[in-house]
């Protein structure tokens, strides 16, 4: 079945302006694959589910031992199928606030406790360069970043420019439909960046997270407290984050119960329930300790489904 026939079945807007007229993603000789499947190139960005790591850089491999969220770093996360990352941008200290001092650190810089970069400093430039290298060697994957930001926008622009990531960012206009994954790949705009800071017209590529998307509450202490309710944002946008991690009584990520909430059957049931309740599939499923449980397998299953009520495919 050719691309044009597929699009006639899927409705207007399927064939974006970036598709060469004769390109058929289902024809192996055309050589375009998106997230491992040619047909996913036809999916719009908001009609796909991406596995996401919370505080992606806060790992033992990155020498973060206090307030860590995962055991393994970016390389392992990428190889495990993670394609969306939550990052916290800070300056190195309250005195070291130049553009070269931008780091990924976990914590509140206004805390009366230690500055977060004292106990969890990760080189943001090196981290993003590695991500860019991984993306360059991938086969049609779109990546998303959600920044909890504590530095000026101009410092982020330098960071993304010097690491080569600014050249590949996609800019979304609020209220406009999201493009297909294939369009984004072919157009070289395979990176979407959100930040939880207010909109700044100087940086249209830094999408205000809670204007362009929304999320569920996060950091509950009990699994029974997890819900599909709106946490931040309006609950109307088709792009949304299903936050799926528990916090300990001290407010840190809970490694003991991560495997419980990331369990395949448990997480799949929650995702399908929220899909039904919300009306849109979760765009992102965000977890702590991604190594425990099967978040990537859950997203593989969800992406094989066109509706929450459909037949659930076999376990990957």
Roles of regions detected by a PLM:
Residues 1-22:
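Secretory targeting signatures
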Residues 19-316:
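Catalytic cores of phosphodiester-bond hydrolases, prominently lipid phosphodiesterases
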């Amino acid at each position: 079945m050719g691309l044009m026939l597929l699009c006639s079945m899927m409705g207007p807007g399927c064939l974006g302006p970036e598709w060469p007229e004769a390109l058929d993603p289902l024809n192996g000789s055309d050589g375009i694959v998106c997230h491992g499947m040619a047909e996913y190139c036809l999916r719009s960005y908001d009609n796909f589910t991406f596995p996401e790591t919370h505080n992606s850089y806060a790992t033992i491999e990155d020498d973060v031992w206090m307030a860590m969220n995962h055991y393994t770093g970016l390389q392992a996360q990428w190889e495990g199928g993670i394609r969306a990352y939550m990052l916290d941008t800070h300056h190195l200290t309250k005195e070291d606030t130049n553009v070269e001092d931008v780091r990924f650190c976990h914590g509140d810089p206004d805390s009366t406790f230690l500055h977060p970069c004292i106990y969890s400093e990760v080189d943001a430039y090196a981290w993003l360069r590695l991500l860019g290298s991984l993306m360059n060697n991938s086969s049609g994957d779109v990546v998303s970043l959600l920044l909890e930001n504590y530095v000026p926008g101009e410092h982020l622009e330098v960071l993304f420019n010097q690491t080569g990531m600014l050249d590949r960012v996609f800019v979304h206009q609020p209220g406009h439909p999201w493009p297909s994954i294939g369009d984004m790949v072919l157009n070289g705009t395979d990176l979407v960046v959100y930040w939880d800071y207010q909109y700044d017209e100087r940086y249209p590529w830094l999408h205000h997270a809670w204007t362009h998307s929304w999320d569920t509450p996060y950091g509950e202490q009990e699994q029974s407290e997890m819900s599909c309710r709106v946490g931040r944002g309006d609950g109307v946008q088709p792009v949304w984050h299903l936050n799926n991690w528990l916090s300990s009584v001290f407010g840190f990520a809970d490694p003991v119960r991560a495997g419980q909430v990331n369990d395949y059957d448990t997480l799949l049931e929650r995702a399908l329930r929220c899909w039904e309740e919300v009306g849109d599939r979760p765009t992102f499923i965000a977890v702590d300790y991604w190594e425990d449980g099967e978040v990537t397998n859950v997203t593989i299953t969800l992406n094989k489904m066109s509706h929450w009520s459909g037949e659930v495919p076999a376990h990957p």
